[in-house]
């Protein structure tokens, strides 16, 4: 572990410096990492720039995920695109369809003669971004999955010593937390489509969409209005009456409800771990997602969120050599260990995970391995390997609108999810027609 800490400190020190040789070939990466995550990005980029003198990577923050993807598309049309762009997972099908715009990572590595072993990467992470024959299209960067964060002090006050394992227990534990005065509400959530519908589906091994959630064809259709989905969403809506569940908003907007001690549990991205450590004044645990025991005997696997690095065409051969070297650097065991241990994201390589696991890190940081275990403890099924759906950025907006209508009592779960399926399928057909 001392060796790991020593080399991680080297990565940090290198990131404090900037600039390489004046004649270095310039390469550019547009990303969506702000705040502390942006600082970690700059540390890694600084380390790469100081590790060699041939290339200089310039990292440019372009706003949130949607803004970054939109900016890259506009830049490509204007022939002013960066070499690399960070795109969130829901943009995967859209990027794959843009065959004239993307330079597949596996092909770039081969063309530039850069050694590249895909078996190094955690299968549950890279599977989302590969072709049907296992070729990597983009390099996973900030990968996460939804988990349960729980307030240990509140649980102790309520006479509870562990997180709920099932949704049945979520209701029971929440009511006990409220009645004991330990918290105002039981739980809140974030990224609601991702956590309460997409991962809910894979965790229960039920289809979110036909055609293996889009992996097997563009003629996929949504089916997240099944009886199990309706039951789940309606239960959440009903739980609002007793403060068992409280909606705090999209993305991470509900996090303050947990950080301020109002809600005793938070279901959101594992990537928020670092931020919660800074914003909470109590010890909290991290546990796996709950499942409906009335529906399944045990859960399947969750899927990743976050984003991946796509290489865009239009650069020179020498520039792509620099991009390939940068991606090799990004995959370095110590760079990945630094990224994993300093953020809430999972490592993308088996080496970085094993290095961390064999140290005392997980013993000293309880729950930091939950995300990896939750994603990879079982081989994925056709229902749980991920989603590959066109126009999904816009479809996520539809899901947010319909879920918020349900939370507000304007629609039942059956009507709201049915409307979301109908509206979403129209966008799927539009994508299919455009990419036949």
Identify the residue ranges that each predicted region occupies:
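Glycine-centered hinge/linker elements that transmit conformational signals in sensory
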Residues: 174-176, 217-248
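C-terminal capping/gating helix-and-loop segments adjacent to ligand/active sites or protein-protein/ligand interfaces
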Residues: 367-423
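Extracytoplasmic/periplasmic substrate-recognition and gating elements
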Residues: 51, 78, 135, 156-158, ...
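A structural signal for short loop-to-beta-strand junctions that line the ligand-binding cleft
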Residues: 74, 82-83, 114-154, 185, ...
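Extracytoplasmic "Venus flytrap"/periplasmic binding protein-like
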Residues: 43-121, 153-165, 264-265, 275, ...
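Hinge/lid segment of periplasmic solute-binding proteins
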Residues: 88-145, 165, 198-202, 228, ...
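Short, solvent-exposed loop/beta-turn-alpha elements that line the ligand-binding surface or hinge
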Residues: 106-121, 206-231, 278-279, 291-301, ...
């Amino acid at each position: 572990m001392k060796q790991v800490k020593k080399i991680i400190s080297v990565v940090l020190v290198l990131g404090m410096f900037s600039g390489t040789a004046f004649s270095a070939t310039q390469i550019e990466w547009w990303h969506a990492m702000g705040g502390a995550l942006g600082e970690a990005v700059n540390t890694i980029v600084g380390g790469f720039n100081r590790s060699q003198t041939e290339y200089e990577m310039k990292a440019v923050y372009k706003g949130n995920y949607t803004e970054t993807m939109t900016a890259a598309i506009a830049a490509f049309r204007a022939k002013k695109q960066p070499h690399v762009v960070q795109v969130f997972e829901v943009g995967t099908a859209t990027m794959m369809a843009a065959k004239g715009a993307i330079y597949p990572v596996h092909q770039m590595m081969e063309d530039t003669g850069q050694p590249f072993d895909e078996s190094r990467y955690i299968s549950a992470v890279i599977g989302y971004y590969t072709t049907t024959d296992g070729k990597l299209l983009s390099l996973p960067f900030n990968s996460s999955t939804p988990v349960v964060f729980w307030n240990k002090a509140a649980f102790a006050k309520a006479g509870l010593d562990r997180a709920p394992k099932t949704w049945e227990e979520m209701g029971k534990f929440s009511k006990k937390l409220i009645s004991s005065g330990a918290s105002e509400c039981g739980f809140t959530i974030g990224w609601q489509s991702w956590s309460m519908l997409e991962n809910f589906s894979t965790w229960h091994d039920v289809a979110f969409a036909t055609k293996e959630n889009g992996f097997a064809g563009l003629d996929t259709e949504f089916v997240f209005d099944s009886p199990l989905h309706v039951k789940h969403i309606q239960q959440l809506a009903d739980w609002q009456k007793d403060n068992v569940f409280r909606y705090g908003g999209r993305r991470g907007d509900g996090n303050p409800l947990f950080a301020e001690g109002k809600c005793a549990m938070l279901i959101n991205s594992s990537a928020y771990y670092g931020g919660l450590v800074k914003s909470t004044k109590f010890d909290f645990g991290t546990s796996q997602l709950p499942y409906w025991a009335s529906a399944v005997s045990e859960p399947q696997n969750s899927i990743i969120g976050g984003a991946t690095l796509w290489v865009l065409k239009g650069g020179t051969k020498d520039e792509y050599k620099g991009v390939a070297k940068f991606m090799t650097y990004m995959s370095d065991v110590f760079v990945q260990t630094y990224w994993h241990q300093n953020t809430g994201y999972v490592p993308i390589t088996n080496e970085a995970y094993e290095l961390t696991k064999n140290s005392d890190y997980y013993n000293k940081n309880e729950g930091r391995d939950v995300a990896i275990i939750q994603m990879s403890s079982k081989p994925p099924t056709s229902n749980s390997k991920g989603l590959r759906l066109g126009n999904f950025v816009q479809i996520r907006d539809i899901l947010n609108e319909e879920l918020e209508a349900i939370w507000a009592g304007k629609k039942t779960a059956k009507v709201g999810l049915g409307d979301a399926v109908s509206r979403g399928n129209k966008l799927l057909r539009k994508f299919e027609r455009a990419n036949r």
